[in-house]
UniProtKB/Swiss-Prot annotation:
Residues 46-57, 510-529, 596-622, 1926-1947 have a biased composition (Basic and acidic residues). Residues 1852-1881 form the IQ domain. The modification Phosphoserine is found at residues 484-486, 1453. The gene is Scn3a. The keyword Phosphoprotein applies. It comes from the Eukaryota. The lineage of its organism: Eukaryota, Metazoa, Chordata, Craniata, Vertebrata. Residues 28-60, 493-529, 587-632, 1070-1113, 1901-1947 are annotated as: Disordered. It is found in: Cell membrane; Basal cell membrane. May be ubiquitinated by NEDD4L; which would promote its endocytosis. Phosphorylation at Ser-1453 in a highly conserved cytoplasmic loop slows inactivation of the channel and reduces peak sodium currents. Residues 370-386, 881-896, 1355-1371, 1652-1664 dip into the membrane without crossing it. InterPro entries: Ion_trans_dom, Na_channel_asu, Na_chnl_inactivation_gate, Na_trans_assoc_dom, Na_trans_cytopl, VGCC_Ca_Na, Volt_channel_dom_sf. This is Sodium channel protein type 3 subunit alpha.
Length: 1947
């Protein structure tokens, strides 16, 4: 940006591009080339200049450049971007100021930039009409493409289109050049699309290619051109492509997992799905004779039986005839069966034979790897998987349910949600980046503006004026608001105005937010050094670096800046304190240009800002970060307040005045800029839309205003809305005349009321102001629609207008915050989704057209393959609408059935490709993006801040008034009573007053302390007490004044930081001690409530402390009764000191110790499990098993007695108060009551009563008692209970949302689903035979006028229907009925009402996608909030599991292990070296993969030869793996069995060898051994560590490992829910009629079957089928007198209400809650795992550290000698690696050494880690934690106390050297003295020799010391000071001290 300023922006910057310009460019390029070779090495990619992002081609010219002179529009201009100064380019600007960049070389080698032809081409290209023309062409073309059989004349239209496209491309090629240089035609990927489309068009036209329709489909790509034309779409497509890139890892993992599962499926179920029930051939056939021989297996090669009697029976033909198989009614495929005991059985007269093809046209099977893979993909996407599940269980046996459980939970839930997590993160990152970029631009523009202003001021203003203006600009940036006309002169006024208006709001927000934001905020993170350089240039233009901010040093200014920051609203929930540390580092670069004092001041300022940001509830941003006007207004006020306070001193006063004047100016300008319309419109509005005629009118107006604006009127209107909704919901079929007339009158009345409200409001407010408010416009529209509907009520076909009345429901949003928020969220995401929806529409359109073009014909020609009547089925692709419906259905996740049809008619490959593309692109990516957007607009702010202002809305005011009134009346009555009866109320009052007082004083006392704490400075010299203080204050409030939370919700969140999360971890000890005293003083405080808004909890006591406290508790049970009881009945309290009281007390103590004993608890848990297990036996066979029945009856009694005893014990031990205040105890109490009641009833002989029977079913709740006993489940339940309020809120809103659709459905379809059915065949009559109800009646008994089971006859039924549509289960039948419906009492006709499909499409988009995903949003959001409450730990985990989790997170607890010693034997040694090399490992992995490949090749019907080959290959593998095992055993000796993987390998090898010899035997009794080979694939996980590229996949697996504990708990809870529902289902639905989804295998007859059914519904699959038979309530649907042999129960009718409740509640609990919790956990852990992997140090680095360590410390002493340290550091991998020469760095690390110059591994690890991460508080915390762990795991370290450190040692050595040197010098001097004394006596010789000798000595000494010196001095500088920016001075000084001292020593 700064370089752009070289050419001053404004009109002067545009220069026409001429020959001279070209020459100049060439000259510059040549100069650069000459310079380049020297510099080439220095320039990294990072620091190369980059093109300016504001001046990219395609963007609009920045406002700063002003208007383009008219003569320069569409002309070649010199490039504005300095980056292109020496590159051959020029730009062209069109009228709309869009930038087009061209290459300045000759296009097509002939057209130079100034060639007239090229100029004309450019003019056409840049003109806006040109792109409009292309756009229209594309759209028209799309319309033509949707025609399924176009008329002949369209051929010519086709030519026209091709012509236009060719013209477009030619223009582009002429203007740009073809492909050689940058910015030419083919350099833009979007142009490739155009080019290929045109080439295809000509090829299909002139070359006869046979299958043209396939090529014609390529024309569809033209629709994609819309993307290249509309600007917003490119970015969305960019985001999509980004997310797909991100998905690569997940995709690889998914494919891998699916392959593994597919292999397992292949091994388990190969060929199973072909088992069918075959009719035993009739006795007269030749078959009977041959049966024996058949079973002896003498079949010849073509399947004919050869027999001695020579009569042949052609078995093959018999099997091939489908009519011999057993087929159920309404099914296409024969019934499957299996030979296992738990598999499906055949009816009498049939046998189970493997024959014929697989189900579903042969496409569902596990026969080859590819089909198995398809089946698993289908399982993963959960499409119609219940069918696959049922088929497989039928054919293979019920035990294989385990396989499906694994695949659904690990494959489906985990992988699909990972995809979601990745997409959401990609979206989030994209968002972050764009936001930061925007902020950076903002800042840069800001700078440029100031620059411009300064230049202009200097140029124009008189000295006095300039002085004044300088004064303005001094005030924290408010001066920037000033823009007078004189300034605008340089920018042509129009563009300036435009620019100003466009950004005024935004800037106002910026300034008033924080007058001076901390520097770090102003330039966000994403900056290359280059931009900093640019900025330095920006500043220096003014001649003084950081010109704008230097003024901060004046005291007033600094005051202002701090104050200003007080008013800055919190950005959004995500900007936490932590972000400041990161930012400050980045700021460093900027502070380089400031002088020292300034930068530190500025810096500490920014730190302080971060702490004192108060939380202002009124100023939450709306989700998309914009600021509402009210907020701007508030903020403006706040800045006034500041200036008022500043008026105290004169300079302040002066400034405040100027602020005021500036603000008024700005306000005026703002008002002007707000006006959207021309002034004449305002004149008109003033006259006609503001009614102030005469006084009497004004009085009327005032009166009306009083009435209409009163809160009670609002309340009344709200009640009317609710009533109106009720009236609309009461419509049903069949309705009596009276009822419908009541509804009609009601509607008229309500319409009247709403019309009156609107008219009165218009009178009161004037139309002009009335229509300024959104809600009023909404009201107006609805009222006018209602009036219109009254007028047009009788017009045929306009009944739809009635549904507009439903929109009235939305008026509730005004007073119902959650609904309002929800509508806002949907609104926001629809806004953000606008582009996305367009992309989705384009994708759907393209695929619909492709499908129609490719498969349309085939559907027509081969229709008999998929439909016996040879009529097109409902789902086909023969025309565009149906094709669109199929694509939409695929987007809903239902692709497999339509794909089978497609594959059957149009061939497998193409269909697979197209459907998979739609599935992957559409479903996975786009819908997930949808979800990501929804979740991102769901920040916790939205939920908490329901209203923009904290004002109460009218409704609340009205209700409050009523409440007050009621309270007043109550109090009056109470007082009368008191006066009458009591004479001493005063005493009590005083007493209460005292109480309150004491509370208050206590409160203030605590706050007092906290205030002192506030200013305890910690080591950093900054005030960290804020955290402490506010958290303490909060506790107090928490304890005493609950109401204050309700009245002032902001209180709960006022703790911006609590102690543990402040930036400054090293708090002083004194502070902590005072904290702890405080805590003691409030022992009652419950730990969980300690700090709701904060993320840090009070530290739990250490284990030792707990142990001491517990025994005290044990001795004393609580009081029996509450204080209230004791007051009323004093005899409840007994003295425990003597007599009976003492005995009672001892009894209680005994009970207490029993109840608290571990064994007691264990015993009770055991009993609970047994009693729950007993319930599972009560299935339909219980009548036949008499012994079991009697046993269960006795057991039941025993259990009941035991539980009653337990309850009594607990009552005595805990007292009623404690027992009945615990929710879990209540649960126990109620469940015991149920057992008690049924026991008593049985004893009295009432057991057959209906009420008692239904009570018995409540025994199913018994397992719930296990909840409180298993911590894992209890944790999850607590989390869930916490989420219930918000889940209920959203549920209510969804119900309201659905209500609208339900009422609409009733309006559209009530009573129209009835149809006439032939009783004998069960099929529907054709309209030609039966037209209406009376025709059907005429046919008598053989016909029946029947309704569809799930219909829209009333609102309740509508809800059920909508639930089926929303879960996509059973929705087809409802949709078919709707589409076929004609009118009430008319026989339906096939697709008569085709466009009713759209009702369902709309509902699915809004009712299903939005509302169901909102649940996910709410649940995730809630758990995040609860997580904050629980101190940032995962709430689904128990303490134990948290430990595991932490261990997983940091494997720092690893201690160095002894490596396996190398064997002494030479041969063994060689083998050992070979085996321990990485190459060996990798080669084994490759072998494993190859082994898998050979397993994949296996198919069901392979030839004998193939089988032989495969078995030989398998043999080879067994030999190889045995070889590996032997080699390892030889070299590793007994150590081989110390490694888990080795044991696994050993088992697999043994099994394989045994399996070779005993294959038949094992397969018969066990699972086939091939399965174990599949498990071997898990070993691949080991190589992931060796591959650098696999980091992403490792992250994903790590996320899974981290989620396991939590997922296990959720799984347990789900199992419990399933268990209860299974028992409930058994007792209610065991005997229903077998039809639809209930049959002989899938039913509720036994516990196992119930579980199988419930597991299937957990994913909401096929619940409609299970519900259907239960909806049969009367004959002829079912038989109430049906007899069930072996049981006394009669009838097979269901109970619809119980059934609906059962299934709906189960679906809501399991699907919405448990499954979504699953999603929440995975999303959470995925983000944690990605953060972990993004951190500079990961687990693997620690592992690698220890692996290298083992080599240097073979005996695992945990110490290493100092001399080896250098080699060790050099042997590590990065990032811990310290390459040689590293002595200096190592010494500087100051490592502690123990005797023998040894260093401990942890110390080294810490020093190295610190080097990577830099100093930080967290580091110390981590260090302590790791040391504790280390000590725990190996106590040996204690004995070695460090005696010195490396740095000390070096200093000692250096010091010693210095001392020695000085001493030598001293000796030398002495010597010289002596010599000089004896000088005279010496000869000349001696005199010459000695000095020489002395010199030599000195030289030697110096020579000695030089390396030392360099070493020492550099050691102090070697570690880079990470905290020069972030740490305040004091600490810096302290840190420097030792370094300076050491320097001093060395000198």
């Amino acid at each position: 940006m700064a370089q752009a300023l070289l050419v001053p922006p404004g009109p002067e910057s545009f220069r026409l591009f001429t020959r001279e310009s070209l020459a100049a460019i060439e000259k510059r390029a040549a100069e650069e080339k000459a310079k380049k070779p020297k510099k080439e090495q220095d320039i990294d990619d990072e620091n190369k200049p980059k093109p300016n992002s504001d001046l990219e081609a395609g963007k609009n010219l920045p406002f700063i450049y002003g208007d383009i002179p008219p003569e320069m529009v569409s002309e070649p201009l010199e490039d504005l971007d300095p980056y292109y100064v020496s590159k051959k380019t020029f730009v062209v600007l069109n009228k709309g100021k869009a930038i087009f960049r061209f290459s300045a070389t000759s296009a097509l080698y002939i057209l130079t930039p100034l060639n007239p032809v090229r100029k004309i081409a450019i003019k056409i290209l840049v003109h806006s009409l040109f792109s409009m023309l292309i756009m229209c062409t594309i759209l028209t073309n799309c319309v033509f493409m949707t025609l399924s059989n176009p008329p002949d004349w369209t051929k010519n239209v086709e030519y026209t289109f091709t012509g236009i496209y060719t013209f477009e491309s030619l223009i582009k090629i002429l203007a740009r050049g073809f492909c050689l240089e940058d910015f030419t035609f083919l350099r833009d990927p979007w142009n490739w699309l155009d080019f290929s489309v045109i080439v295809m068009a000509y090829v299909t036209e002139f070359v006869d290619l046979g299958n043209v329709s396939a090529l014609r489909t390529f024309r569809v790509l033209r629709a994609l051109k819309t993307i290249s034309v509309i600007p917003g779409l490119k970015t969305i497509v960019g985001a999509l492509i980004q997310s797909v890139k991100k998905l690569s890892d997940v995709m690889i993992l998914t494919v891998f997992c699916l392959s593994v599962f597919a292999l397992i499926g292949l091994q388990l179920f190969m060929g199973n799905l072909r088992n069918k029930c075959l009719q035993w051939p009739p006795s007269d056939s030749a078959f009977e004779i041959n049966t024996t021989s058949y079973f002896n297996g003498t079949m010849d090669s073509n399947g004919t039986f050869v027999n001695v009697t020579m009569s042949t029976f052609n078995w093959k033909d018999y099997i091939a005839d489908d009519s011999h198989f057993y087929v159920l009614d309404g099914q296409k495929d024969p019934l499957l069966c299996g030979n296992g005991s738990d598999a499906g059985q055949c009816p009498e007269g049939y046998i189970c034979v493997k024959a014929g093809r697989n189900p579903n046209y042969g496409y569902t099977s596990f026969d080859t790897f590819s089909w198995a893979f398809l089946s698993l993909f289908r399982l993963m996407t959960q499409d119609y998987w219940e069918n696959l599940y049922q088929l497989t269980l039928r054919a293979a046996g019920k035990t294989y349910m385990i396989f499906f459980v694994l695949v659904i939970f690990l494959g489906s839930f985990y992988l699909v949600n990972l995809i979601l997590a990745v997409v959401a993160m990609a979206y989030e990152e994209q968002n972050q980046a764009t936001l930061e970029e925007a902020e950076q631009k903002e800042a840069e523009f800001q700078q440029m503006l100031e620059q411009l202003k300064k230049q202009q001021e200097e140029a124009q203003a008189v000295a006095a004026a300039s002085a004044a203006s300088r004064d303005f600009s001094g005030i924290g940036g408010l001066g920037e608001l000033l823009e007078s006309s004189s300034e605008a002169s340089k920018l042509s006024s129009k563009s300036a105005k435009e620019w100003r208006n466009r950004r005024k709001k935004r800037r106002q927000r910026e300034h008033l937010e924080g007058n001076h934001r901390p520097e770090g905020d102003r330039f966000p993170k994403s900056e290359s050094e280059d931009s900093v350089k640019r900025r330095s240039f920006l500043f220096s233009l003014d001649g003084n670096p950081l010109s704008g901010d230097k003024k901060l040093c004046s005291p007033h200014q600094s005051l202002l800046s701090i104050r200003g920051s007080l008013f800055s609203p919190r950005r959004n929930s995500k900007t936490s304190i932590f972000s400041f540390r990161g930012r400050a580092k980045d700021v460093g670069s900027e502070n380089d240009f400031a002088d020292d004092e300034h930068s530190t001041f500025e810096d500490s300022e920014s730190r302080r800002d971060s702490l004192f940001v108060p939380h202002r509830p009124g100023e939450r941003r709306n989700s998309n970060g914009t600021t509402t006007e009210t907020e701007v207004r508030k903020r403006r006020l706040s800045s006034y307040q500041i200036s008022m306070e500043m008026l105290e001193d004169s300079s302040g006063r002066q400034r405040a005045m100027s602020i005021a004047s500036i603000l008024t100016n700005t306000m005026e300008e703002l008002e002007e800029s707000r006006q959207k319309c021309p002034p004449c419109w305002y004149r008109f509005a003033n006259v006609f839309l503001i009614w102030d005629c005469c006084d009497s009118w004004l009085k009327v107006k005032h009166l009306v205003n009083l009435i209409v604006m009163d809160p009670f009127v609002d309340l009344a209107i709200t009640i009317c809305i609710v009533l109106n909704t009720l009236f609309m919901a009461m419509e049903h079929y069949p309705m009596t005349e009276q009822f419908s007339s009541v509804l009609t009158v009601g509607n008229l009345v309500f319409t009247g009321i709403f019309t009156a409200e609107m008219v009165l409001k218009i009178i009161a407010m004037d139309p002009y102001y009335y229509f300024q408010e959104g809600w009023n416009i909404f009201d107006g529209i609805i009222v006018s629609l209602s009036l219109m509907e009254l007028g047009l009520a009788n017009v045929e076909g306009l009944s739809v207008l009635r549904s507009f009345r439903l929109l009235r429901v939305f008026k509730l949003a005004k007073s119902w915050p959650t609904l309002n928020m929800l509508i806002k969220i949907i609104g926001n995401s629809v806004g953000a989704l606008g582009n996305l929806t367009l992309v989705l529409a384009i994708i759907v359109f393209i695929f619909a057209v492709v499908g129609m073009q490719l498969f349309g014909k085939s559907y027509k020609e081969c229709v008999c393959k998929i439909n016996e009547d040879c009529k097109l089925p409902r789902w086909h692709m023969n025309d565009f609408f149906h094709s669109f419906l199929i694509v939409f259905r695929v987007l809903c996740g239902e692709w497999i059935e339509t794909m089978w049809d497609c594959m059957e008619v149009a061939g497998q490959t193409m269909c697979l490709i197209v459907f998979m593309l739609v599935m992957v692109i559409g479903n996975l990516v786009v819908l997930n993006l949808f979800l990501a957007l929804l979740l991102s607009s769901f920040s916790s702010d939205n939920l908490a801040a329901t209203d923009d202002d904290n004002e109460m809305n009218n409704l609340q005011i009205a209700v409050g008034r009523m409440q007050k009134g009621i309270d007043y009346v109550k109090n009056k009555i109470r007082e009368c009573f008191r006066k009458a009866f009591f004479r001493k109320p005063k005493v009590i009052e005083i007493h209460e007053g005292n109480k309150i007082d004491s509370c208050m004083s206590n409160n203030t006392g605590v706050v007092e302390i906290s205030k002192e704490l506030n200013y305890l400075k910690d080591g950093n010299g900054t005030t960290s007490g804020v955290g402490t203080g506010s958290s303490v204050e909060k506790y107090v409030i928490d304890e005493n004044d609950y109401m204050s939370f309700i009245n002032n919700p902001s209180l709960t969140v006022t703790v911006p930081i609590a102690v543990g999360e402040s930036d400054f971890e090293n708090l002083n000890t004194e502070e902590f001690s005072s904290e702890s005293e405080l805590e003691e003083s409030k022992e009652k405080l419950n730990a969980t409530s300690s700090s709701e808004g904060s993320t840090v909890d009070v530290a739990p006591p250490r284990e030792g402390e707990q142990a001491e406290i517990e025994p005290e508790e044990d001795l004393k049970p609580e009081a029996c009764f509450t204080e209230g009881c004791i007051k009323k009945f004093p005899f409840c309290q007994v003295s425990t000191e003597e007599g009976k009281g003492k005995i009672w007390w001892n009894l209680r103590k005994t009970c207490y110790s029993i109840v608290e004993h571990n064994w007691f608890e264990t015993f009770i848990v055991f009993m609970i499990l047994l009693s729950s297990g007993a319930l599972a036996f009560e299935d339909i066979y219980i009548e036949q098993r008499k012994t079991i029945k009697t046993m269960l009856e006795y057991a039941d009694k025993v259990f009941t007695y035991i539980f009653i005893l337990e309850m009594l014990l607990k009552w005595v031990a805990y007292g009623f108060q404690t027992y009945f205040t615990n929710a879990w105890c209540w649960l126990d109490f109620l469940i015991v009551d149920v057992s008690l009641v049924s026991l008593v009833a049985n004893a009295l002989g009432y057991s057959e009563l209906g009420a008692i029977k239904s009570l018995r079913t409540l025994r199913a709740l018994r397992p719930l008692r296990a909840l409180s006993r298993f911590e894992g489940m209890r944790v999850v339940v607590n989390a869930l209970v916490g989420a219930i309020p918000s889940i209920m809120n959203v549920l209510l809103v969804c119900l309201i949302f659905w209500l609208i659709f339900s009422i609409m459905g009733v309006n559209l379809f009530a009573g129209k689903f009835y149809h006439c059915v032939n009783m004998t065949t069960g099929s529907m009559f054709d309209m030609s035979e039966v037209n209406n109800f009376s025709d059907c009646q005429a046919l008598g008994k053989q016909a029946r006028w029947k309704n569809v089971k799930v219909n829209f006859d009333n609102v309740g039924a509508g809800y059920l229907a909508l639930l089926q549509v929303a879960t996509f289960k059973g929705w087809m039948d409802i949709m078919y009925a709707a589409v076929d419906s004609r009118d009430v009492k008319l026989q339906p006709v096939y697709e008569e009402n085709l466009y009713m499909y759209l009702y369902f499409v709309i509902f699915i988009i809004f009712g299903s996608f939005f509302t169901l995903n909102l649940f996910i949003g709410v649940i995730i959001d809630n758990f995040n909030q609860q997580k904050k409450k629980f101190g940032g730990q995962d709430i689904f985990m128990t303490e134990e599991q948290k430990k595991y989790y932490n261990a997983m997170k940091k494997l720092g607890s690893k201690k160095p292990q002894k490596p396996i010693p190398r064997p002494a034997n030479k041969f063994q040694g060689m083998v050992f070296d070979f085996v321990t090399r990485q190459v060996f490992d990798i080669s084994i992995m490759i072998l494993i993969c190859l082994n898998m490949v050979t397993m994949m090749v296996e198919t069901d019907d392979q030839s004998k030869y193939m089988t032989l080959v495969l078995s030989r290959i398998n043999l080879v593998f067994i030999v190889l793996f045995t070889g590996e095992f032997l080699l390892k055993l030889i070299s590793l000796r007994y150590y081989y069995f110390t490694i888990g993987w080795n044991i696994f390998d050993f088992v697999v090898v043994i099994l394989s060898i045994v399996g070779m010899f005993l294959a038949e035997l094992i397969e018969k009794y066990f699972v086939s051994p091939t399965l174990f080979r599949v498990i071997r694939l898990a070993r691949i996980g080991r190589i992931l560590r060796l591959i650098k590229g696999a980091k992403g996949i490792r992250t994903l697996l790590f996320a899974l490992m981290m989620s396991l504990p939590a997922l296990f708990n959720i799984g347990l809870l789900l199992f419990l829910v399933m268990f209860i529902y299974a028992i409930f289902g058994m007792s209610n639905f065991a005997y229903v009629k077998k039809e639809a989804g209930i049959d002989d295998m899938f039913n509720f007859e036994t516990f196992g079957n119930s579980m199988i059914c419930l597991f299937q519904i957990t994913t909401s699959a096929g619940w409609d089928g299970l519900l259907a038979p239960i909806l049969n309530s009367a004959p002829p649907d079912c038989d109430p007198d049906a007899i069930h042999p072996g049981s006394s129960v009669k009838g097979d009718c269901g109970n619809p209400s119980v059934g609906i409740f059962f299934f709906v509640s189960y679906i809501i609990i399991s699907f919405l809650v448990v499954v979504n919790m699953y999603i929440a956990v995975i999303l959470e852990n995925f983000s944690v795992a990605t953060e972990e992997s993004a951190e500079p140090l990961s687990e693997d680095d620690f592992e690698m550290f220890y692996e290298v360590w083992e080599k240097f410390d073979p005996d695992a002493t945990q110490f290493i000698e100092f001399c080896k340290l250098s080699d060790f550091a050099a042997a590590l991998d990065p990032p811990l690696l310290i390459a040689k020469p590293n002595k200096v760095q190592l010494i500087a690390m100051d490592l502690p050494m123990v005797s023998g110059d040894r260093i401990h591994c942890l110390d080294i690890l810490f020093a190295f880690t610190k080097r990577v991460l830099g100093e930080s508080g967290e580091m110390d915390a981590l260090r302590i934690q790791m040391e504790d762990r280390f000590m725990a795991s190996n106590p040996s370290k204690v004995s070695y106390e460090p005696i010195t450190t490396t740095l000390k040692r070096k200093q000692e050595e250096v010091s010693a050297a210095i001392i020695q040197r000085n001493y030598r010098c001293y000796l030398l001097k002495q010597r010289l003295k002596n010599i000089s004394n004896t000088y005279d006596k010496e000869t000349i010789k001696g005199r010459i020799v000695l000095p020489i000798k002395g010199d030599m000595v000195i030289d030697k000494l110096n020579g000695n010391s030089t390396p030392e010196k360099t070493d020492g001095s550099s050691s102090t500088t070697s570690p880079p000071s990470y905290d020069s920016v972030t740490k305040p001075d004091k600490e810096k000084f302290e840190k420097d001290k030792p370094e300076k001292e050491s320097k001093g020593k060395e000198v």
